[in-house]
Each structure stands twice: as structure tokens, then as C-alpha cells.
Regions:
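Class I SAM-dependent methyltransferase Rossmann-like catalytic core
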Residues: 1-55
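Structural motif
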Residues: 33, 61-64, 87-88, 134-137
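Well-ordered, non-membrane alpha-helical segments in soluble/globular domains
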Residues: 36-46, 69-73, 97, 140
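Conserved class I S-adenosyl-L-methionine
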Residues: 52-67
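Conserved SAM-binding loop of SAM-dependent methyltransferases across substrates and taxa
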Residues: 65-79
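Conserved SAM-binding motif I beta-strand of class I
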Residues: 79-88
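S-adenosyl-L-methionine
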Residues: 88-131
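A short SAM/SAH-binding and catalytic strip from SAM-dependent methyltransferases
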Residues: 128-140
Length: 140
């Protein structure tokens, strides 16, 4: 995994997300777009590939804005049908959708506001998750 595919669709979505962020939320968006965030997500995707994992329905725990991980996963695993980002920070939801507009429009991505430490993540409408990715294990 050497790069993130920066497509015209991604450029549009990211511009809209960053333009929509204001004040403290803009600072948080910019903080989320650092080298270590991208490198760690690229490493994760590469390791999943090395293990020959073929994810279909992914539960993303504490995915924050998910601007790197969601496109990296979809671009590298044709098997993926669904990614659900479980995040407790209510402020990120609209911007996470802006970053990932194309996946939301295709009904392939959802943000659910949940505390992954205490809330039940599975509901009757949830798919059966075959892959769980914890993006914030150092905080739990």
C-alpha cells in the first residue's frame, strides 16, 4: 500500500467537508489529516491484504471522520459491501458523511453515534459484521 487514490470525486467530497467545518471543528478536521493517520490506515489495509482477508461487512470502531480508512478499504477490497463507522462524537457525523459522500449515496457507508465501550452496536437492521476494525484502541 503506497498511496491513497485521490480521485476527482474524493477531491470534491473533501473540499465540501473541509469547507463545511468551522471553528474548533475545522481544527479537529485538520488534526485528523496528518501523516500518522494516513500511514497507520495504509499499514492496516496492507496487513489485511497480506493476511488474505476478504471483508464484506465492516464494523469500524471509533473511525472519527474516516476520510482515509473508508476509501482505502473500498479501493483495495472488491469484496466490501458495507462499512459502518461507530463513533461516539456527535460532531463528526455530518462531516464524515461529507468526506464519504459517494459511499453514503451508494448505500455503502453509515455513521452510527455509539459509545463502543458501553453501547450495544448491533441492532435488528445491522448486517452481520465479518470484520471489526478498532481505530482507537490506544484510547480504550
Amino acid at each position: 500500500m503506497e498511496y491513497l487514490k485521490y480521485t476527482p470525486e474524493m477531491a470534491r467530497d473533501w473540499k465540501n467537508a473541509i469547507s463545511a467545518s468551522e471553528g474548533y471543528l475545522r481544527k479537529r478536521v485538520l488534526d485528523s489529516m496528518n501523516e500518522s493517520q494516513l500511514v497507520s490506515k495504509m499499514w492496516l489495509v496492507e496487513e489485511l491484504s497480506n493476511l488474505n482477508v476478504k471483508p464484506v461487512n465492516i464494523s469500524l470502531l471509533a473511525g472519527w471522520f474516516a476520510q482515509y480508512i473508508v476509501p482505502l478499504l473500498y479501493d483495495n477490497f472488491e469484496s466490501i459491501e458495507w462499512i459502518e463507522n461507530f463513533e461516539m462524537d456527535r460532531d463528526i457525523k455530518s462531516l464524515a458523511y461529507k468526506f464519504n459522500t459517494r459511499y453514503k449515496k451508494e448505500d455503502k457507508y453509515k455513521v452510527s453515534i455509539k459509545n463502543v465501550m458501553f453501547d450495544n452496536l448491533v441492532s435488528l437492521s445491522s448486517p452481520t459484521f465479518d470484520t471489526v476494525i478498532n481505530c482507537s484502541c490506544e484510547h480504550m
